[in-house]
């Protein structure tokens, strides 16, 4: 999968979901949705750690993660949701996601003296 394919499909679906206008949500609303998903990723990671340490965890039936594999997969799914919303937020503020991701990744590599660049 290429990022451009995800960005295009994501924007199309968001427009469909928002009756043809994803811009009816402002940047703060898209950021809030992204933060909600990031919070869910954090919660899944917490549950994973409890499983790793064999610490009891009381969960609602629909949020019960009984195995480390299930918890790891849930962390990954919530991270994916976060990324999907992050791409919509970047779209909403009118910035090219590939350009900004490349710029930020390369700047961090330069800052720490790492050779990796994209």
Where do the language-model regions lie?
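Flexible "arm" and connector segments at domain edges
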Residues: 1-118
């Amino acid at each position: 999968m290429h990022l451009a394919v995800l960005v295009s499909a994501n924007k199309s679906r968001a427009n469909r979901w928002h009756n043809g206008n994803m811009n009816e949500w402002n940047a703060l609303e898209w950021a809030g949705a992204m933060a909600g998903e990031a919070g869910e990723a954090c919660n899944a990671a917490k549950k994973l750690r409890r499983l790793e340490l064999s610490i009891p965890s009381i969960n609602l039936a629909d949020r019960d993660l009984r195995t480390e594999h299930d918890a790891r997969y849930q962390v990954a799914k919530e991270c994916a949701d976060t990324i999907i919303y992050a791409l919509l937020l970047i779209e909403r503020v009118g910035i090219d996601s590939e350009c900004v991701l490349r710029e930020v990744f390369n700047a961090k590599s330069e800052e720490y003296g790492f050779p990796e660049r994209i």
